[in-house]
Amino acid sequence: GMVMQDFALIEEYTVQENLLVPLIFGKVKKREQSKKIMDVLEKVNIAELKDKRVNQLSGGQKQRVAIARALINSPEYILADEPTGALDSNTSDDIMDVFEELNKNGHTVIIVTHDNGVAARCQRVIEIKDGEVLSE
């Protein structure tokens, strides 16, 4: 799953419709789709927004929809580009808790960040500048 820094959501779709797209491509059975959507929305604390259009959401809410979309098919690998950039500190902590739980359950989570607080919560940090590895 991929979390884009600019969210890459379909603005005219509802939250639920945005999450349905990867389920359809992932060939998830129709009867399982609603449950998967609600489960992932609850995980990122935005279940109440499922019927809202994305263009009506705040930046932090869009960020959580983008994270939910990346997680919806339970991918083995998750690449998250600045996944907490649009979030307040409490929500950022909650999302990092989700990533840590996924990691404990065998998922590989790669986070690209400029936030030292986020980096401090990672198991392994690689510092890169101008394409060169500065430290590991």
Model-derived segments and spans:
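Catalytic "switch" loops of ABC-type ATPases
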Residues: 5-10, 24, 115
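ABC nucleotide-binding domain "signature" region
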Residues: 32-44
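Conserved signature/switch motifs of ABC ATPase nucleotide-binding domains
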Residues: 52, 73, 105
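Short coil-to-helix segment of the ABC ATPase nucleotide-binding domain corresponding to the Q-loop/switch region
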Residues: 13-20
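Conserved ABC ATPase signature
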Residues: 53-57, 61
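Hydrophobic anchor residue at the start of the ABC signature
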Residues: 67
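Catalytic Walker B motif of ABC-type/P-loop ATPase nucleotide-binding domains
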Residues: 78-81
